[in-house]
């Protein structure tokens, strides 16, 4: 295992105090470091593997460090590790060790494994530049499957990617269209049906679900008059759907517009 520290590890004392197992190699934070895979028993198709990376000791890094990374070594399979926001300047994840895709490509590596962004994204296919994301969703903004990328290298040193789920608990936002529903109980029935379908289709893991009810319906006033009471009924209905926890219920319905006579 080769790892680098990012902003979360730099900001907290506990990860720095943990004693790592003998098979784990943590890369330096002062400057980029290269590790020959032979030192840790790693080879690919009888080809040498080199890991290039730098961890960070600070929770805030504004510097582009990529140009300090060494060029990839010819004849070896070169893997780059970097904790970075790329060129992003806003959104959920703060700007961190910013760089461009062209900066990464200039190092002539065969694979870039990036951290910091929690959503899995393949930024570029050739050479692969990949955010595997985090391995467990922590809240509704991290919905969907979470895991890692399994990288297989063929006899021509060409990598192929396969996403492997690792999460043990999955978040999901469930939108239920209640258009035309006349009564609150009708809406409950629609939600119950949707929850059962969700568990049937994605129920290999326990689910945490945010239910969003939309649409124009006569039941709107009934729902709007006591939203928390109806939300509790949704939670009770979910108990019969399987391993589902309803995190929140949001009623975004509207009254039916009556055409002027």
Question: What is each of the regions a protein language model found here?
Answer:
Residues 1-160:
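His/Asp/Glu-rich metal-coordinating catalytic cores
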């Amino acid at each position: 295992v080769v790892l680098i520290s990012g902003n979360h590890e730099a900001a907290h004392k506990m990860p720095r105090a943990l004693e790592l197992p003998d098979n784990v190699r943590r890369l330096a934070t002062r400057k980029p470091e290269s590790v020959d895979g032979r030192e840790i028993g790693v080879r690919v198709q009888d080809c040498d593997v080199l890991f290039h990376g730098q961890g960070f000791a600070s929770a805030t890094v504004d510097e582009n460090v990529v140009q300090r990374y060494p060029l990839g070594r010819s004849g070896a399979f070169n893997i780059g590790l970097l904790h970075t926001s790329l060129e992003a300047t806003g959104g959920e994840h703060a700007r961190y060790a910013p760089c461009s895709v062209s900066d990464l490509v200039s190092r002539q590596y065969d694979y870039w494994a990036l951290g910091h962004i929690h959503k899995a994204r393949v930024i570029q296919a050739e050479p692969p530049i990949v955010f595997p994301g985090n391995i467990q969703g922590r809240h509704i903004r991290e919905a969907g499957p979470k895991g890692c990328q399994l990288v297989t290298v063929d006899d021509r040193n060409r990598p192929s990617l396969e996403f492997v789920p690792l999460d043990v608990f999955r978040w999901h936002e469930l939108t239920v269209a209640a258009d035309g529903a006349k009564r609150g109980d009708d809406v409950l029935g629609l939600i119950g049906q949707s929850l059962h379908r969700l568990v049937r289709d994605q129920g290999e893991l326990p689910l945490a679900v945010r239910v969003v009810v939309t649409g124009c319906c006569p039941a709107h006033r009934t729902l709007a008059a006591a939203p928390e009471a109806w939300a509790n009924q949704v939670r009770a209905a979910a108990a019969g759907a399987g391993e589902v926890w309803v995190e929140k219920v949001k009623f975004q319905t509207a009254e039916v517009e009556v055409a002027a006579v």
